[in-house]
Design a protein with these regions (language model features):
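Basic, flexible linker segments flanking DNA-binding modules
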Residues: 1-61, 162, 216-224
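RNase H-like two-metal-ion nuclease catalytic core shared by retroviral integrases
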Residues: 39-40, 44, 133-135, 141-142, ...
Length: 227
């Protein structure tokens, strides 16, 4: 489920993710092994859209350009390695995670849940929206393509095997995993899920960016709306 509005998190500006994890009693064991990138490409299984974004990642209009992708995490239960998957949607206006879903399997349902939330959040955009992704199987599905068309949304896809066409998502996943995942072993799905949820809230509300005039994504959006 989406916890953007439901997770209780400290309001102290200097409190980082590690301290929040400690406060919530989340225990992890360190290790240093960088996981292989998850690849959702299964060939041409549906409709492959043209790359309409062309790496034009900047926009001065909230909710106009949205990008998405899927990434994989590993955790352990009773000594057995298992996996979970994160499907976030990011607004290129302010790099805010506007919706996401975490699941135990790489399913279209998980992509669709996050998509529906993103459609609702961005429905106030006065211009035609563009939703960008890679050529993963879920984004080629008939239901996904039809849903974007029904909302008059341009669908855009990266060129095959070109991660730079969706570098915003690549950088986001890299940052997330560097700060809360690499160097840790999680003992349950719930533990890993909670840490991801906490970090996304921290990222949206606390993590300042130079390109956002040293504001967090949500601060930048609110400042824009109030001016």
């Amino acid at each position: 489920m989406n916890y953007l509005s439901n997770v209780a998190i400290s309001r102290q500006p200097q409190e980082g993710t590690a301290r929040l994890m400690k406060k919530l009693g989340l225990r992890v064991t360190s290790y240093w092994h960088k996981s292989r990138k998850y690849n959702s490409y299964k060939g041409k299984v549906g409709t492959v859209a043209k790359n309409k974004l062309h790496r034009r990642f900047r926009t001065s209009i909230p909710h106009q350009k949205i990008t998405t992708d899927t990434t994989e995490f590993k955790y352990y239960e009773d000594g057995i390695q298992k996996k979970c998957y994160l499907n976030p949607y990011i607004d290129l206006f302010n790099s805010e995670v506007i919706s996401y879903h975490i699941s135990k399997q790489p399913s279209y349902q998980s992509i669709d849940i996050a998509l529906n939330q993103a459609l609702a959040v961005t429905s106030d955009c006065p211009y035609r929206r563009t939703f960008h992704s890679d050529q993963g199987w879920g984004y080629q599905m008939r239901d996904y393509v039809s849903k974007l068309k029904s909302h008059r949304i341009f669908q855009s896809m990266s060129r095959k095997g070109n991660c730079h066409d969706n570098s915003v998502m690549e950088n986001f996943f890299g940052l997330l995993k560097q700060e809360i995942y690499y160097g840790h072993i999680f003992s349950s799905f719930e533990e890993l899920e909670q840490v991801i949820v906490i970090w996304i809230r921290y990222y949206n509300t606390k993590r300042i960016k130079q390109k956002l005039n040293w504001m967090s994504p949500i601060q930048f959006r609110l400042n824009y709306q109030n001016n």
